[in-house]
């Protein structure tokens, strides 16, 4: 991203602006300051950094930029430009006037949707976009020097952990969250939908809500977006939005604790919890209204439009689920580029559990075990999404990356080489131990036969986990998931046997 910014700064382009946008704490301001710090003394003397405020207008910006141009300034960095309510509808001022006059204009902000809308209208074909929302594990590890997948899950692809002050009204109140420049950066991960609402409210005087206006007017747009984000399957189906809201994390963990193999960890704690009260508490934390409070029905059109805006924010990517049936259509599988939102919701769930009377009456050990198990379940599912997403982004056009489901069971990930007609199959486990149950699907002859029928010979069977690399006698390769993610930029998936070397990982 940084080199793209410098390329723009020192190019001969004279009619385009550079847009640096993404969610909060993804390095936008740091990138701008780094670019300024690397300037020559001469260029620095002609550079200005402006921090926009909510009270600023494009008329004020126009006046100031004229003065700066007359004073000899040619490099203008404007941070948080999307805070100005009339930015989207007047953004062409930057490209058509000041960039055309020879100024290099760099605009940055957290409202990604605002930039997306501006690029479709005012800045169409006149902007060089630089996206910062998605920070892959390898980049996070390089920048912060922390080689821990759990830390990455906690930070969720940003350079800051999720908001934990769930009971702090000053933090959660909308007016407090945006009361100044710094508090704007504190808006809660679980309320990311406010990004959408702010941009749409500013665009064409709020006239572009389309079919979502009824939800927005009734105060239920936040509910609809959050239901999509929380759903464990990440599917945009009407049933997800209209069913009574329940915590999928809580239901799954209760089931797993009942069937825990270790008798010391087996417990029915969650069966005795007042789940209705817990769910109500969680909904309050996430600003979600239940079905009984929902006055506006959710339609397919609502779902499509919400999905479109979440995609524009770069929050979601579709990684389809394939099935063993060659004639069946792939199933939509939405991955979030910011896993921290999911983890933040799980933390909110644990926080609400601690307030439940039944749970509070238990021993500290029981509370710790239960809370830890909930977060372990969440981290496991998030790890699968992270590996799928980053592998898919690293693969070239000759390779497809997807999850493969069968009538019973699934492969967490398949990498299919369309050119060579061969594949590699993976299980992804949030564990540091090697357990036969982890790779049982990889050795299931029926599943493997069905896979090879559709996707050619299986050239490798892998378990990505948090332990050390090792190859078992049965041919299953265990590989450290953190090293796997760090190696992804050099993805060169090809049959290792053809290279005449021993295969210890997906020839990467």
Predicted regions and their residues:
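Interdomain motor-coupling "hinge/lid" segment immediately C-terminal to the ATP-binding subdomain
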Residues: 117-268
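N-terminal pre-Walker A segment at the start of P-loop NTPase domains
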Residues: 1-9
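Sensor-1/coupling segment of RecA-like P-loop NTPase cores
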Residues: 97-119
